[in-house]
Amino acid sequence: MPYPLRFTQGQKFTLRADYEKYAQTVRQMFNNGELAAFRTEIEILLGDSDIRVMSYADTPGGISRIVAARRDQRGCLAKQHETKDSVTIYRLPSAYDIGPAIAGALAFGPPGAVSRAVFPGVTRPLTPETGMDFPEQITIRDDAEYETFPRLDAQIRQAGTIQSHWQPARKWGRHADKETLAWIDTSKGAYILSRDFFTVSPMSKKGLEDRINQLISEDVISIRAHRS
């Protein structure tokens, strides 16, 4: 299963014979049954992709697990249902829609009102000058200059991470060597963390989509360099 999709309900079969019988049924559905129409999408999602985008979020309704992938001009998305081991697969209009599809599949509140802030316990403690106590105004170094940002005090309602990757997965889970996009939805609006995790800024659907597309664009550059 591609990260973050996973089995959550334990073993469905106690006897190996029952498992093998079910596996044969799935193969038949995949080859010439109701799954045949999505054979290409399933192959792309299971590893035969150029780029895949993985979204994991802890939401009030449960864990949100979404993965989108593209190959050549095709794009698809798989969304796992929170309370059971079933996945809905969507065929996207094109390979270039995986970023918008991930952003559109996530539900969160309106953008926060603070243009840029630090969030104790979420953003990284930053400088020796500020220490670890997070005063009301926090001064951090930004582009060789020191700037002061307000502290955001709010209740976190949900939080999520998104990664893009172009290389085959060696193991299940996030990739430590890849950039992680992180976001939070709070009682004072939705925020996205800066790439260095030092601050948060308001997050809209379009803003999230743009950040995802940025991750994808960097993978496209890596693919071209690898193939040249």
Residue ranges and their predicted role:
Residues M1-S228:
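Short, surface-exposed polybasic-aromatic patches that bind anionic ligands, especially phosphate groups
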